[in-house]
């Protein structure tokens, strides 16, 4: 039997690597179980779906941010025929918040959506990868975890810390 060197066949040694696990911490809640401030944030996200411009996907997303100092900001997805030129609700809210309140840390975000039938989605939706990265940047600037409320009619998922949405995040430029 041959003995292969790691330097010659590194892919073969993947089989012998130690497996690791990640745990994602979240709570599954009803709207009524949320504290009043989070209920208000969810309602604002739901309202923001009404300002969405989604003539192509017909999927209307709203996001609401809670900033330091009890400031709330809402944003919605804005589509464009040149698909890459559109903006997600989460980034609309984040970028407006930072441009209008640059020193205020983001404390929480609620995200809600209306499907093609015009109704709020039964199940929670979650941010795309680009929005997750933008949320991580906001969390890094704030220096503390952001609470995330993923909203659906059936239940709401609450996470604390963007790392629970984005394991193995791109976290710094060397």
Task: Please give the residue ranges for each predicted region.
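Short, compositionally biased leader-like segments
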Residues: 15-43
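Short beta-strand scaffold segments in enzyme catalytic cores
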Residues: 58-67
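Short, basic/aromatic recognition patches
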Residues: 41-54
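Short glycine/proline-enriched turns and hinge-like loops at secondary-structure junctions
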Residues: 56-58, 87
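Zn2+-dependent cytidine deaminase-like catalytic core
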Residues: 74-174
């Amino acid at each position: 039997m041959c003995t292969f060197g790691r330097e010659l066949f590194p892919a073969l040694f993947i089989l012998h690597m130690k497996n690791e696990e990640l745990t994602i911490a979240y709570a599954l809640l009803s709207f009524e179980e949320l504290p009043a401030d989070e209920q208000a944030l969810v309602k604002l996200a739901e309202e923001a779906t009404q300002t969405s411009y989604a003539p192509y996907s017909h999927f209307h997303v709203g996001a609401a941010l809670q900033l330091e100092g009890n400031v709330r900001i809402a944003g919605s997805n804005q589509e464009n025929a040149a698909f890459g030129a559109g903006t997600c609700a989460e980034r609309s809210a984040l970028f407006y918040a930072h441009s209008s309140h640059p020193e205020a840390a983001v404390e929480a975000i609620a995200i809600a959506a209306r499907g093609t039938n015009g109704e709020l989605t039964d199940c929670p939706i979650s941010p795309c990868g680009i929005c997750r990265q933008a949320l991580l940047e906001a969390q890094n600037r704030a220096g503390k975890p952001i609470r995330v409320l993923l909203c659906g009619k059936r239940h709401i998922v609450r996470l604390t810390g963007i790392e629970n949405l984005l394991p193995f995040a791109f976290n710094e430029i060397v």
